[in-house]
Amino acid sequence: MWYYNNEEYKDTPEEYQGFVYEITELSTGKKYIGKKNFWRPKTLPKNSRRSRRVKTRVESDWREYYGSNVALQRLVEEHGSDGYKRVILHLCKTKGEMSYMEAKLQFMFDVLLSDEYYNEFIGCKIHSRHISKLKENF
């Protein structure tokens, strides 16, 4: 179960690409900050009605997702998901916005220096044009 603004979140909003999240292990308080897409690309094959392949998008596995950190995934598999709280911190309209907000929070909370986080690396490549909508509100 995901939470957003202290309420259970079940929507898959068309207008958002994805979100930045925090997963907390309830017994230890240890956390993980990451990002996840609501959608994944899918290419439909040619058929009798289509002479070309069509690119579309389908819902991703975000509802069951517990981060990309291997140690965290293993703990969830071994002990079950009930011991973890998943919170959406920011809904994002673009992939660039997701990458920016994820990196911003990871640096803000020193996730690589702190033993309070599962994060093991920060990877991002963001151009200012990818976050132009964020710049307008800055």
Model-derived features: positions:
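Structure-specific nucleic-acid interaction/processing domains
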Residues: M1-F138
